[in-house]
Curated annotation (Swiss-Prot):
The gene is hemL. The keyword Cytoplasm applies. It is found in: Cytoplasm. One of its GO terms (cellular component) is cytoplasm. This is Glutamate-1-semialdehyde 2,1-aminomutase. The keyword Cytoplasm applies. Keywords: Chlorophyll biosynthesis, Cytoplasm, Isomerase, Porphyrin biosynthesis, Pyridoxal phosphate.
Length: 432
């Protein structure tokens, strides 16, 4: 998989130049490898389950562009569809049939969505859905969960992922306290904390938003009854329940977490997979609520590139591919083999670890666990994870460069890829 010696000379040169051109040398912070040390490798191309860097090193990829590459990178049918779409233009700024097609697929696939609006990113979708929550309820406060990430909009940068654990204070300079004052936080998987917030702020909370399976504090699944409990509480309080399924939508089941767990939210955000690797986001829900969105209603939201034909094309083809029989069974099979193998090898090597998976989404923590929330996740041995990440990179395996990010498999990953990954892990974990 690698060249005879692990050489990243070209990556180092390109990244050094990038740091003079872009803040930190990247266009999204996690890419800079700050959490794991060293400098990032610079990609040259991707295909299937593999990525190649500019030095010619090949890696088995478990990041998948942070989730969209569920079919594998550069799937030939997606590429073919995009070539045909390019011949018609890159952006219309006007209605096109492709929007209808993808909208129908999303509505058919996601149980709670009756109407949908396309945007250009998950952050945009979450920004819009917060405005919609407030417009519909006439209330201003929201509840989010520690470690859940809903994009980089001001109102969500409170205890977001690896943010500062302070009460009601923003996790980034430049975010006014007045903006985050209406953002209430609770520990994930803690229904009593949610009930207490509603009791402390009667008739003031517009809704509860969460990643139904946390992926931005590492992989943290919901405890049994947690999602159903939130549904019950919000209905009792006249508040909305919002699932941020940017990561889990079409990933852990075709209908996302709401299909997997049988709990229907009022509103849902989507992204990643529905764009097939191109920039996209969406939000949707009950017709009654979505009818407030302009121009049907008074809640304004717009976007120059929203619904652009290239993203719609890639999304349509991707959903066509993954709705075929056996997709999620296969993802579950190979991901179970991967995470169970990693856990076994790590424990045999004397490390305290825990982890798990749902379909093609997984995570591993260097702590005995269990991990139920962000505070539990922070008990992970970050130095050990960093060494593990670097060792796996040198063995030709590309993992997310942060302990606080979930990993992903794809339909392009084979049993042989998993075997090679576990062989690499055995070498690395026995050396830590």
């Amino acid at each position: 998989m690698l060249t005879s010696t692990f050489n990243t000379t070209k990556s180092e040169e390109i990244f050094a130049a990038a740091q003079k051109l872009m803040p930190g040398g990247v266009n999204s912070p996690v890419r800079a490898f700050k959490s794991v040390g060293g400098n990032p490798i610079v990609f040259d191309r991707v295909e299937g389950a593999y990525v190649w860097d500019v030095d010619g090193n090949q890696y088995i990829d478990y990041v998948g562009s942070w989730g969209p590459a569920i079919c594998g990178h550069a799937h030939p049918e997606v590429i073919k569809a995009l070539h045909a779409a390019l011949d018609k233009g890159t952006s219309f700024g006007a209605p096109c049939l492709l929007e209808n097609v993808l909208a129908e697929m999303v509505i058919d696939g996601v149980p709670s969505i009756e109407m949908v609006r396309f945007v250009n990113s998950g952050t945009e979708a979450c920004m819009a859905i917060l405005r919609l929550m407030r417009a519909y309820t006439g209330r201003e406060k929201i509840i989010k969960f520690e470690g859940c990430y809903h994009g980089h909009a001001d109102m969500f940068l409170v205890k977001a992922g690896s943010g500062v654990a302070t009460l009601g204070l923003p996790d980034s300079p430049g975010v006014p306290k007045s903006v985050t004052a209406n953002t209430l936080t609770a520990p994930f998987n803690d229904l009593e904390a949610v009930k207490a917030l509603f009791a402390d702020h009667p008739d003031q909370i517009a809704g509860v938003i969460l990643e139904p399976v946390v992926g931005n504090a590492g992989f943290i699944p919901p405890d049994g009854g947690f999602l159903a409990g939130l549904r019950e509480i919000t209905q009792e309080q006249g508040a909305l329940l919002v699932f941020d399924e940017v990561m889990t939508g079409f990933r852990i089941a075709y209908g996302g977490a709401q299909e997997k767990f049988g709990v229907l939210p009022d509103l849902t955000t989507l992204g990643k997979i529905i764009g097939g690797g191109l920039p996209v986001g969406a939000y949707g829900g009950r017709r009654e609520i979505m009818s407030l969105v302009a121009p049907a209603g008074p809640m304004y939201q717009a976007g120059t590139l929203s619904g652009n034909p290239l993203a719609m094309t890639a999304g349509i083809k991707t959903l066509e591919l993954i709705r075929q029989t056996g997709t999620y069974e296969y993802l579950d099979q190979i991901t179970a083999k991967l995470i169970n193998g990693l856990l076994t090898i790590a424990r045999e090597a004397g490390h305290q670890v825990c982890g798990g998976h749902i379909s093609g989404m997984f995570g591993l923590f260097f702590t005995a666990g269990p991990v139920h929330n962000y505070e539990d996740a922070k008990k992970s041995d970050l130095a050990k994870f960093s060494a593990f990440h670097r060792g796996m990179l040198e063995q030709g395996v590309y993992l997310a460069p942060s302990q606080f990010e979930a990993g992903f498999t794809s339909l392009a990953h084979t049993e042989a890829d998993i075997d090679r990954t576990l062989e690499a892990a055995r070498v690395v974990l026995n050396q830590l």
